[in-house]
């Protein structure tokens, strides 16, 4: 078997997008809203459907672990996921299957690379809303096994450079695990871009007349970074990433974006933008890096050349 990273998606997780869609799993009902971003995810779903992956790997900033990088390690998980900040829009009944073999391989490769890793074995674990939201938005059928990865808090309690270095190692370990297990995988970076946001909610949450960028600076940073990604200027994106994080309060600080690109070996590959929009003022872009189309997806036995990124 030859492993393959088919594609990577920037797949943000505003629960409002699920709320606006009114799926049967989500208890609150809406009048719609955030259509541009939901349409963007419709395009991403079509792309994913054509890829036929074995597994979806998602790194979420809302499964926060202070000690080490944790992986879902229970074959089946179900329950109700509730957004603690927006329980009025997201109370979601989930049921998912976990690729435990691949998760264990990721943990082992991370451990061998010097990271602290741990398998989450609690059968009653309530999966965080970031993981659930991203997975629903990209694959509402819930018919593809997943690997859920926590966001180790090192970028915050150490510093951005040290934290991103850990995420770089984690991404490379993930790549090696996919190679050794022969999986055909899609990576999901569950991150918004600029994360400045409003502090008061409209009476009707889906009132789109109240939805716009929280700050001009955050919006301008988002557009600058999106343009670089669309042009395939990955090295420049990562050179600017620390400044972007500081000035736009960007959620990519939590590590998913770096993890994904490290696993993909930081390709200088133009990303496709499916859509950009705001949710409570934060900047959200749904984007795809199609490695299979570019001839960069296969992970052969000789795949040992790991390009160092700007985080090195």
Swiss-Prot record:
Supply the SUPFAM superfamilies for this chain.
Answer: LigB-like
Q: Name the InterPro entries for this protein.
A: 2A5CPDO_B (IPR034943), Xdiol_dOase_suB (IPR004183)
Pathway assignment reads: Xenobiotic degradation; nitrobenzene degradation; Xenobiotic degradation; 4-chloronitrobenzene degradation
Keyword Iron attached:
yes
**Keyword set includes Cytoplasm:** no
What GO molecular function annotation could you give as one example from this UniProt entry?
ferrous iron binding
Q: Name one GO biological process term.
A: catabolic process
Function per UniProt:
Component of the 2-aminophenol 1,6-dioxygenase (APD) complex that catalyzes the ring fission of 2-aminophenol to produce 2-aminomuconic semialdehyde. CnbCb seems to be the catalytic subunit of the complex. Also active on other substrates such as 2-amino-5-chlorophenol (68% activity), protocatechuate (33% activity) and catechol (5% activity).
Name used for this protein in its record: 2-aminophenol 1,6-dioxygenase subunit beta
Native source organism of the sequence: Comamonas testosteroni
